[in-house]
Structures are given as C-alpha cells and as structure tokens.
C-alpha cells in the first residue's frame, strides 16, 4: 500500500491479503498485482503463520450452510445436525425487554463521576499546564443510545465510528439522488501522503484507509468535517467548501483509525496515531492544540505495537479505548472550562487490563504476541465489548466505575481468528461479530466468519454463524431484519438476523474493507476499484437494485459518513471527497 512496484512483491502482508482474496475469488486471485501501488489495499502487519489450533473437546458451534438456509450444530464428537433454538432466544429477549421497561419506570441510574486522583500515574502522560482559573465542570448528557439514531448527544452529528456506543448508527439523510463529487481535499494538486515504517522498511502511504470514517458535526452555526489521514494529520474542514477551518494538526506518524468528537458539546477531538499516542485535542483555539496524550507504553505489560486504530468511546466523562498495545484502557477525562473560557482536561487513567489471558496465548502457540485490539469498543447495558487479533471477544462490566468498583470481565468467546471488525450490538443485546480467515485454523472453520452471539448465554453463546472463505474485516451493519456484511473477497451478504439465512449477496471488486452504511433504506458501499455504490434495500428479501455509482481515485477502505444529503469519504488515491447532489 503506497510503495513502489519494485517493492510490492514479497510484501508479507500483501501476499497474505492476496491469498485470502484468492480463496474467496479464485478467478480474480491475481487482481491485487494489477492495482496501482499508491492505491492498493493493505495494513501494517507482518505475515502471520497459521498456528496449530487448540480446541476444547466440549466446544459446540452453529454454522450456516453455504446456501444460507439452515442452521446446524457441530460438536467435536458428533456429526452436524439441525437445532431449534430461536424460540428460546426470542423468549429471553422478551424477558430482557420487560426488565428494561421496568427499570425505566423506576428510573435509570446515571453514572456519577469522581476523579480517582492517582498522582502516581501523572508521569506516564503528556499534559501541558492547565488553563489557570476556576474551572466549570462539563455537564454530561451522554445517556448511551440504543441501536439507531437516538443519541441525545449535546453535539449534533456523526461523532464516532458508527455513531455511538452500539456502533450501529450511520448518519442522517437524505441520501443524494444523483450525486457527483462536489469538492475534494486537498484543494491543490497532489494528495495526502506520508512515509511510515513497517518493521525495517519505510514506505509511502496515501489517502485514508481502514477504518478512516470522518466525523461530521455542528459547532457554532457551522458544520465541521474532521478526519485523520495517511499524511500524519488530523484535518478540520468546512462541510460546504472543503476549506480548512483550522490548520491541520500534525502527529508523528500516519492515522488509520476514526476520530471521535466530544458528545457533550465540549470542543474536543479524540484520536490515536501510529506515533504511539492517543490524544485529546482542543479545537476552541486558533490552532488545534494537544491537551493530553496517553503513550501506548505507559501501561504494562504490552504486546504487538503502539498504534491506536480504534475510535475512542466517550460516555459520562469516561473514555474507553483498546490499543494495539493489546490493552483495554479507561480514562476519566475531568473536562471543564477555565476562567478564560477555554476547554481544559485533567485526565486520569483509572483502569487498564490486558486484552488477552493465559488460555488465549496457549491456544495461539507461536503467535502469542498477536493480540492487538484494532476495533472500536462497543457498549450495552453497563458492559464494554471488543475483540482482538487473537480472536478473543470479551465483555467488561464497567457499571460500578462511579462507585469505585473495578471493571470485571463477564463474557469471553474465542473465534479462533483475527477479529478486527468492531462488535455491533442490536437493541436486544445480541452481538454481531465479523471474523477474518487468514490462517485457516480449525477453530475458525468451526465457528465461522460472521457470528451472532448471545452474551447472556456465556457457555454456549452462538446463535448462528456464516462461513466465508476470506472472512470479514469490515464491521457489519444492521438494517431492519437483516445484517449486511461486506467480506474481504468482495461478497456483500445480507443475512436474516433471526435465522442466519442468507437473503442475498452482491459481488464487488474486493477487498471490501469499507464498513457498510445504511440510511433511509439505501446501502452505501465502496469497492476496491474506487467505485462508491448505492443500492435500494427497502425490500430486504430481494437482491437490491443499484441506484447510482460515483467513481473515486483508489481503493475505498474508509467508511463514509452521511450527513444531511452529503457523503464524505477518503480513498487510497490520496484524496478526501464530498459527494452530493449538485
């Protein structure tokens, strides 16, 4: 990705991706080698050898047949057989819903925040001196939204990857009817490119990549578009014109993840970079200003590397983030406004924990360090969910934080494969997890690559799963009664959320790493030929008709943001686009 043709061949990650793509689409198995090196897909990983799988003898799972019509169970000591379980699931969901309604009638307890004040950890962080003067604490309005657009945030907009805690909100319509490129960024010729080291090699990266979703939000009567890119910068541009609102904020390396905007109206941007730092940036000054940064090596032990791919989740003055250092972090932000009217923070790392355990590392054998957290954490009913590159999906109960109760792990499930897609949660609390298929492990073959889990059944959580040869890097999207999931090889699946049956598929030039976006019954999906497609998914039972396409430059790995008639997305050709009706 972004290197010369002469160095493209022999790239271990590139060859891993090509092999995965070839498994999914043998007829296009050489397609990667024909893509322009400045625009081709890929991320910053060395080659991964398939570990010898370790299976628990009592493990059972459910796999959807290739035609997607039946759910079957497989155990280690018996053949596959059909199983009815959905009536029990629906009954459980109804009981949970009743309890939620009862709790709402009594009154939902809000998180009350208190600073732990652990002075011993101050030396671990970078922080310029606070603004002097008596602070005014920031009010918190971030009641965690359910699946869908109901946010209740003080800041109107699409504020984090997939919009909110359940990672299931995609923006606001209308969807453009006959769109074209309205502007591209940067305005001058050229693109957003920078060098970044991978192992012992330095190469050029261009544009924006996985996940790379921009944030779009209203501030002081103006609509901002904020995104990180492979030029090492965070950009703050005007919705209408594409001109800089603030000068770009430069970090020390490329930015691969999606930025987050403070949901409570504080002028703060939260973002990580490949330069080791997770930052809090103020935007209420003539220039974007770093207020604080957490170093990836500020906690111990760590594994893998120092990047921050996940989009931070901010709720009730706590920031939740997993890092490629393989740790899960919780930071009390202590946001306030100083006497000079400028925003300030006094962050405190109140909790961190390894994202791995001994059972996982034993299962990974020679790949015991391959446990980075590269997805964006999700939240539902007091529990934070995330997965890691070792395939461990886990849930941590954080409901006791205001009372000083340390978070504890309450859910554990092993997919057997790299799991970088963010966990998506529906309004009944079910989890939808996309799993890659790079190593060909026996465990991944058992579990499948698109999995619906019930965390209330921790000993047997699989509701259904779907197998795909290349697996899923993109985060699935919920739409009505289906989950829409783009696979690495270019197949886009629509799967019945209750039964796991495949309703329809689309075949696009892969890899399709862009997470699907669905607003107003319209699916927005980019492909690796640089084409952004729109499909009518108002009838989820039929293959959707295509409504329009827009050609961009380079593979579309980043997830678009839709806000009030305009789409915003970057591509690997080096530019960022505003797309809408003229």
Segments (PLM) and residue ranges:
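N-terminal targeting leaders characterized by basic, low-complexity, disordered sequences
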Residues: 1-75
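N-terminal export and membrane-targeting signals
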Residues: 81-98
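Hydrophobic core
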Residues: 99-106, 142
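C-terminal region of N-terminal signal peptides and the immediate post-cleavage residues
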Residues: 103-131
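Extracytoplasmic/lumenal domain signature
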Residues: 120, 128, 133-139, 143-156, ...
